[in-house]
Amino acid sequence: MADKITDEYAVGIDPEIYANNPAYSSLFNPYIHKQTIIADHVSVQCHIDLNGIDAVGSKFGNLNAHAGNFTSLCAPNCLPERFALVAYTVEYAFLHDALNQSGMTSVSTRVSDKAQRKSEVQAKIAAEYLRLDPVFGEWFLNKWQTFTACVKDVRSLEFPSLDDYLEFRIVDAAADWTLYNFRWGSGITLTPEEEKIADPMSYVAYAELCLVNDLFSWDKEYASHIKSNGDVPLVNAVHIVAVTQGLTHCAAKAVVQAEVRAHEERFCQLKEQYEATDKPSHEVLRWLRLLEHSMAGNWVWSLCVPRYCKVDRNPYKDHLEKYGSDAVRVLTPLDRLCWPKQEIKDMKQSELKDPSSSTYKSHFSPLEPNPGPEQMRLTISQTQQQRPVLNPYTYINSLPSKNVRQTLIAALNSWYKVPVKSLLIIEGAVNFLHNSSLLLDDIQDGSFLRRGRPVAHQIFGVGQTINTATYLMNEALYLIQMLSPSAVSVYTEIDEMRNLQLGQGRDLYWSYHTHVPTPAQYISMVDGKTGGLFRLISRLMRSEATKNSDLDISQFATLLGRHFQIRDDYQNLQSEDYTKNKGFCDDLDEGKLSFPIILSMQSPGFSNTALSSVFKGSQKGQTLSLEMKQYMLEEITARGAFSETKAVLRKLHTELLRLLIETEKKAGGVENWALRLLIMKLDIAEEKKVAPPKSDSHWGVNQRRAWKGCQKNGRPIDKACFLRAMEETLQK
């Protein structure tokens, strides 16, 4: 079975690079990707995107002029369509140590140019994973959050033994995160059962990778530790062995080298045992092959790499000089970013203008959205006189939020380059307006929960909450008057503020009178109520722009509002997360005629008598029973309304991507990855259960599994016995 595992894209590297080097003693032969030039290109591209062209090569990652690119060596069978993204991400991870840790989806308007570049690179990576594979992308980004949190915790710990250290190091060094990325890139998919079978072998390989990394990076890390007078901690296997076993660093390095060989030997033994089982999985064998490639690739790459030792020439600067800045930009050119292509090609503009048409029906595999980044807000200076008025605002402002509007402001600033002072004013005004609308919405809708917490008016009273909401509108105007006259006219003379109130009024009228609007009427209401604030944001920023002041994104903002509101309607009735935050189908309690309900009540061949009666009852303040809500969900489902709603969302999602590409071209080709990520995160998916990231305790279990077993003579062994047996073999 193992003989059938082929290397489609991998080729062996020249043995002269490593065969005669005494520092290379791996049991495995190294390979490299046939298209390694792509990995080199995107590695340089990542430097340009992150720090600008003048800073290319100021830090070191993938590139190695001696042996080849790290990603090319460790994932030599990576699929061509995923290769560039995988290599770009690994390059960013290499550079990450020199940056402040944060999640892949962090976006802020109040940052330096350097930090803004970092946010844009993170957004590019996140958006591309979500575009290519929503389920894996969701897992992958969550795993990154685990990694960045772990780095802060682990580096302050002490470890009683090397095994305790390795249990943590796998997470600290992002070994599993990196190898899962390589696995996805190589098109390898394991079932949960196959994952469990492979885990002990995976652990041994991950530990070997960490040990080899520690061996080759030791001299550099120790020098940094001494130079900093101990401020830079020593998180390295050599140091752990020296401390726990009372050895010199030289002797500790020899012990670590023996550990590396022991882990490779154990990997081979476990692999042989698995291959001898009945019907070994082809995917598991492909995974084991990838692990072998990664162990060999990491080792040969480490022999002479700028990250660990001085080199005569800078491979990044040499590559840029040879190929130029245009050639290295191979990751997702503009004409490839809209997905899926065929759907866009076949789409008619008339279909997009009327999302209620039957042509909106389609099948797709969308993505469940992540939580948004932490919002940075402009707050009102609270005098003693203001404090009672602001209590409801302070409360609702403190609740968790997806921060879509904050993210939109940060994303649009990539084009408009609004001065910092004006940007903060716009951000603050929008925050006041948004929270004002939330306070009023909760009262008008009769809501009980907001983001999983009691609504403000239940705590502070209806009268006080209404007063706060109207006060916030005045405060928003007060802020906007600090901007240019054109910005003030956007707020006072253009109809967006009127549209917000008129849209909300129509929504309340329909619910109170149980009047079922047409889908087109509903979307018209959404264009005012939700799209109005998005358009207001874009127009305020455009009025203060120092660049692209003629760039009008009103159509994009309108469609974004439609997508946002219809998605919210769908999630309220279908999402487990919404149930946690707002209660189970609370739109039904409120008697709200949301988009899926409107579609269901206009389905031909069905009587609406029962549904109408339920909605009239809810207007009398009756909270619907669980059984009644389940009945209504069954009715809506049977009429195909949820499927049709998803089809509408799919069309809107695709058109938003098309408009984004069109706008990027109008903005001089400036790619807006933060905006692209926002669109991807607002896409909707089935609530699939994705395996949670594996913790260090998980790898502790697999550490014990890896070293428990039988030698060929049938005697039970553990790691210590295995090391002794290997030493005896070498002595013979």
Curated annotation (Swiss-Prot):
Q: Which domain of life is it from?
A: Eukaryota
| Sites where the protein binds Mg(2+) 3 | 441, 445
To which species is this protein native? Penicillium rubens (strain ATCC 28089 / DSM 1075 / NRRL 1951 / Wisconsin 54-1255)
Described purpose of this protein according to its UniProt entry: Bifunctional terpene synthase; part of the gene cluster that mediates the biosynthesis of conidiogenone, a diterpene known to induce the conidiation. The bifunctional terpene synthase PchDS converts isopentenyl diphosphate (IPP) and dimethylallyl diphosphate (DMAPP) into deoxyconidiogenol. The C-terminal prenyltransferase (PT) domain of PchDS catalyzes formation of GGPP, whereas the N-terminal terpene cyclase (TC) domain catalyzes the cyclization of GGPP into deoxyconidiogenol. The cytochrome P450 monooxygenase PchP450 then catalyzes two rounds of oxidation to furnish conidiogenone.
Protein name (record): Conidiogenone synthase
For this protein, the Enzyme Commission number is 4.2.3.-, 2.5.1.29
Name the Gene Ontology biological process terms: conidiogenone biosynthetic process
Q: Which residue pairs form cystines in this protein?
A: none
Chain positions of motif DDXXD 1: 97-101
InterPro entries linked to this entry? Isoprenoid_synthase_dom_sf, Polyprenyl_synt, Polyprenyl_synt_CS
Is Lyase set as a keyword in this record?
yes
* Annotated spans, Prenyltransferase: 312-732
